[in-house]
From Swiss-Prot:
Belongs to the myo-inositol 1-phosphate synthase family. Key enzyme in myo-inositol biosynthesis pathway that catalyzes the conversion of glucose 6-phosphate to 1-myo-inositol 1-phosphate in a NAD-dependent manner. Rate-limiting enzyme in the synthesis of all inositol-containing compounds. This is Inositol-3-phosphate synthase 1-A. The gene is isyna1-a. The lineage of its organism: Eukaryota, Metazoa, Chordata, Craniata, Vertebrata. One of its GO terms (cellular component) is cytoplasm. It comes from Xenopus laevis.
Length: 563
């Protein structure tokens, strides 16, 4: 899509092939010296390049014939065709509700009538989901129309309209290793790739090549939306390095199907995203991605109960309340629930859903001591009758002032695949956009890409994959602000800081009415920046921008601001 607006600034240049933007990245270093905590504002000048040409995007789904795969394909077709259908509650029209890029907005700034909001998708040139070309693999041989009927997600009238299109779509055979998924999946596995592990990986590579050739797409992204696998052991000499992982595949040692798909995708230069909770990205797979400069991301779609948890925990801890018990119960009846009824597969999901609160707990040492965290229990049960309409019940108990207790109880009915499908779209759209963004600091000679472990996808994942040694962020609004502010940086715009000083002064702030000039760095509060949701005025000036680097420790000592 072409740009819907242009930034008027000497720091932004719309060149023939790229948008070039100069950007001052303001951070805050905190260190201790002779018993005094020193706080030092820092600024680094970046130059961003964003390619303006939007490619024709192909997406290959592992598990294309499953509930998520059929639903996201049906949704894109219905939107592309402009379909509508009747239900008992009235007429429904195809939409992309639930997609960050298609159905939410970002604030550009303020105008004569107040704040100006634009669709998130309009911040930078992006692929429109209507233009995505789908393909993929499945262990079940059903065409997508029959698989859609089996899934029982969409209303019958829309299924009837889509059947002529979807019955022509048939998944390619997939890799099936019974040991990695529940035994109850065996009756679906009538469409599998035979041969050694090396031959199976080679077949996946040939499938990717064939799809590129026959569909005429410019690039391909591969996404795993198949069954949850059991966890893999990290074994020295098997999957601890890229070379060992490739040798393990050659020698037929233990390598999960999801990791085999990752290896094939990486070797074909295709970004690979893991939408399930298992540890697909063993150290060898990550090293292989880094060596080949290919993006990988995951893990596990953050769609319903866990997304609410990342909001509610952020609220409770930020409000100074102390959650001490979180009990999360689910029951669902789709094939995901059937597979998760096996203990090893459930354990993968339990780990993914349990770690979502860690960064919020660690952010407040006033409430939590070392190694202290809430009791956290996750239960998932398989109830076939409820199908894709997952029920989630949560109880949050928090300690409040003077020994009191506060309990919040939630009941959440999650249409599982209808919540996951827009997340699939956002994952591939954001990954594709990041492939067109490069940047450098003023001391760099060459532009670089993002790290191969694409942590900007964290907003969309239960268990975010991040580069080694970097913080894992689960708090919902911090994750969202990260995406928005990086996209703003590509346009030379200051990050959202929500100060709104122009509305808090007795006399008018005249300088806000003209283009800002370089300001001297101002003292930055020692208080932690708030986690607002990004729907307000942009930063007032680079010198006053809220920095992100005060860290997670509250230190009882004198604080000195260095300018």
């Amino acid at each position: 899509m072409a740009e819907k607006f242009k930034v008027e600034s000497p720091h932004v240049r719309y060149l023939k092939d790229v948008i070039e933007a100069d950007y001052n990245y303001d951070t805050t270093q905190v260190y201790e010296e002779k018993g005094v905590t020193k706080v030092k504002p820092c600024s680094t000048k970046f130059t961003f390049h964003t390619e303006r040409k939007v490619p024709k995007l192909g997406v290959m789904l592992v598990g294309w014939g499953g509930n998520n795969g059929t639903t996201v394909t049906a949704a894109v077709l219905a939107n592309r065709l402009g379909l509508s259908w009747m239900t008992k509650t009235g007429k429904k029209v195809a939409n992309y509700y639930g997609s960050l890029f298609q159905s939410s907005t970002a604030c550009l700034g303020s105008g004569p009538a107040g704040d100006v909001f634009v669709p998130f998708r309009d911040l930078l040139p992006m692929v429109h989901p209507n233009d995505i070309v789908f393909d993929g693999w499945d262990i079940s041989s059903l065409n997508l129309a029959d698989a859609m009927f089996r899934a029982e997600v969409l209303d019958w009238q829309i299924q009837e309209q889509l059947r002529p299109y979807m019955e022509k779509m048939k998944p390619r055979p997939s890799i099936y290793i019974p040991d990695f998924i529940a035994a109850n999946q065996e009756d679906r596995a009538d469409h599998t790739i035979h041969g050694t592990k090396a031959e199976q990986v080679q077949k996946i590579r040939e499938d990717i090549q064939d799809f590129k050739r026959t569909s005429d797409v410019d690039k391909v992204i591969v996404l795993w939306t198949a069954n949850t696998e059991r966890f893999c052991d990290i074994i020295p000499g098997v999957n601890d390095t890229a070379d060992n992982l490739l040798k393990a595949i050659e020698n037929g040692l233990e390598v999960s199907p999801s990791t085999m798909f990752a290896v094939a995708s990486i070797l074909e230069g295709c970004a690979y995203i893991n939408g399930s909770p298992q540890n697909t990205f063993v150290p060898g797979a990550i090293e292989l991605a880094v060596q080949n400069n290919v993006f990988i991301g995951g893990d596990d779609f953050k769609s319903g109960q866990t997304k609410i948890k990342s909001v509610l925990m952020d609220f409770l801890v930020s409000a100074g309340l102390k959650p001490v018990s979180i009990v999360s119960y689910n029951h669902l009846g789709n094939n995901d629930g059937k597979n998760l009824s096996a203990p090893q597969q459930f354990r993968s999901k339990e780990i993914s859903k349990s770690n979502v609160v860690d960064d919020m707990v660690q952010s407040n040492p006033i409430l939590y001591g070392p190694n202290e965290k809430p009791d956290h229990c996750v239960v998932i049960k398989y109830v076939p009758y409820v199908g894709d309409s997952k029920r989630a019940m949560d109880e949050y108990t928090s300690e409040i002032m003077m020994g009191g207790a506060n309990t919040i109880v939630l009941h959440n009915t999650c249409e599982d695949s209808l919540l996951a499908s827009p997340i699939i779209l956002d994952l591939v759209l954001l990954t594709e956009l990041c492939q067109r963004i490069t940047f450098r600091t003023e001391t760099d000679q060459e532009f670089q890409t993002f790290h191969s472990v694409l942590s900007i996808l964290s907003f969309l994942c239960k268990a975010p994959l991040v580069p080694a040694g970097t913080p894992v962020i689960n708090a919902f609004f911090r994750q969202r602000n990260c995406i928005e502010n990086i996209l703003r940086a590509c346009l030379g715009l200051s990050p959202q800081n929500h100060m709104m000083l122009e509305h808090k002064m007795q006399r008018s702030f005249v300088s806000l009415k003209r283009p800002s000039t370089v300001c001297n760095p101002q003292p930055i509060s020692s208080k932690k920046g708030n986690n607002a949701n990004g729907f307000h005025l942009p930063g007032i000036s680079k010198g006053l921008s809220q920095s992100n680097g005060l860290g997670k420790n509250v230190i009882n000592s004198d604080i000195e601001i260095e300018n």
